From Swiss-Prot:
Catalytic activity from the UniProt record: Transfers a segment of a (1->4)-alpha-D-glucan to a new position in an acceptor, which may be glucose or a (1->4)-alpha-D-glucan
The protein's name in its UniProt record: 4-alpha-glucanotransferase
InterPro entries according to UniProt: Glyco_hydro_77, Glycoside_hydrolase_SF
Gene Ontology MF term list: 4-alpha-glucanotransferase activity
Xref: PANTHER family: 4-ALPHA-GLUCANOTRANSFERASE, PTHR32518
GO cellular component, one term: cytoplasm
Pfam families: Glyco_hydro_77
Keywords: Carbohydrate metabolism, Cytoplasm, Glycosyltransferase, Transferase
GO biological process, one term: carbohydrate metabolic process
Compartments, as annotated in UniProt: Cytoplasm
Group of enzyme by EC: transferase
Predominant cellular place of this UniProt entry's protein: cytoplasm
Lineage, highest ranks first: Bacteria, Pseudomonadati, Chlamydiota, Chlamydiia, Chlamydiales
Origin species: Chlamydia muridarum (strain MoPn / Nigg)
Amino acid sequence: MPLLSRSLRIIQNSPIRKVWNQVDTSPKHGICVPLFSIHTQNSCGIGEFLDLIPMIDWCTLCGFQILQILPINDTGSCSSPYNSISSISLNPLHLSISALPYKEEVSSSRKLIQEMQRLSQLSQVNYEKVIPMKRAFFKEYFRVCKSKNLTNHPDFCDFCEREKYWLHPYALFCSIREHLNYLPINHWSTTYTDLSYISQHEHTFAKDIEFYSYLQYLCFEQMKQVRKHADHKGCLIKGDIPILISKDSCDVWFYRKYFSSSESVGSPPDFYNAEGQNWNLPIYNMKTLRQDAYHWWKERLRYAENFYSLYRLDHVVGLFRFWVWDELGRGRFEPQDPKDYLDQGTDILSHLLKASSMLPIGEDLGTIPVDVKQALESLAVCGTRIPRWERDWEGTGAYIPFDQYNPLSVTSLSTHDSSTLALWWQEAPQEARLFAQFLGMPYTPSLSFHNHKEILKLSHKTSSIFHINLINDYLALCPDLISTNPLQERINLPGTISKNNWVYRVKPSIEQLSAHSKLNSLLASLF
């Protein structure tokens, strides 16, 4: 109780106390699942926006109050949701085709839709087939919309005007990119990289600009439906705002003053990765962002709050300092001086917190300076607690008791970048044995049903305000709902380029989940 009382005092003195008052500090429980991983009987090859509606129904049926998803920004042909070509636009790949009006007027639409729906029955997402099929469908569908004069509808015109800051550059970027057969920006000729040619390109690609803008309008409308349904059901949607953007993105092309392309961001060597990681993502020009009062960042949050009540602030320490790799492969922190990085992080966060009605939850895993953690807490920004990693690393290495977690946090047993609980138990037997001992459980080489259920139950009883686990860790309570190969239950292996990354598909459909009485009763008993 003293921990919670302290957190309540911090909240009431923070710039986001009004947001906190809306969410409240009672314990919250949720499920995290990538949108690309879910499917219904209507899904066309990949999880679609409106699939989130029955997903919300299932979550609330089981007693959860939060549905967390990974980023849903447009990633072009890339499967990683953290490597987007736009910081704001949604990914048209997730448009629910079956809900589009006049879809049946697309030539061979029935056959195309059936083919795409069959792809949803595969054990993994097949981007190589889904992306070209959906792109072809959308081209034909747009022609139908034009013939119906739908692009002159006042709602679409209002959307284009309201979102012109990001929408017009994005639509032009996509048009040029398609014209150049999706070449990366560093292979574009000066005609396309020199922004003085923009008015010329706007004329040349006018029809394509309208096409890409209309797709974004459809994405917006579908996600607004999802948000409306979530509000009706009392479910909070937690989005994910990647801190960085691809070098091959609209933002780096058009808002280039906010980025430095000569160096790239990554993570330093640490306990989990001896060599560190180079993410090959551009570093921000913080001086220019600050001069513009972080307008670019505020626009991202403004649009996202159409859909989300909470958001995961990816790699939140990056707002304070980044690990930067130069062209020779040498790494350093930028900025290095504690006063400089604390001033920088506190300044940008103060602006962002005041600019949004969403509650941020920081991803503060890895090497985080104590003073950064203290700064985040003083602003009432939650951190992330992964029990298997929550240990006294500076001292005995003992696990931190669950009732000693800072209430301003989310407890999660696994992340999209880690192994699932069962896979970790299998791959790290020494750690698993210590963890079982810490919890007072009998150790078994393979994670038993009893231990699995008890660990899940305990994860919902930590002193964190939020408790959100990957859907994979819940489904593992019923072996018929997961793959027989535990490696296929992993979403991503950081630092690797693999055909197994970002292709995870939930084995049962949402309809099957909703009808699975054994699983649903087990989940309802966890909290």
